[in-house]
């Protein structure tokens, strides 16, 4: 998330850990950026557009990867606190709404479902919850083979 220290990667990491702990498969934009740019110390950056330009970071490519995962694999999208300020998270949320996927919002380190119309459902995401879940971290319920 631009404008946040380290592009808010620590919050992405914490959310991914929480959601994996609840049994979800997680597609984290932060983890994907670290894989795509392994020589970059993302956690030392200030989170500016200038840094992305210097790195030749393809925001369009990254968003394409995120949205492709959401469209093809995700059961829902988890939105970090402050997601409304992120162009990418707003796009991911809009795609989730268009596809009738569940959306979950983080409030005080807990996850709650948002209804398709944006209303607060008040249902807390718990381990073993039937539905799956991107500041968008795109999620999918883990299934045993």
Residue ranges of each PLM-predicted region?
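Conserved catalytic or regulatory cores that recognize and/or transform ribose-phosphate-containing ligands
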Residues: 1-145
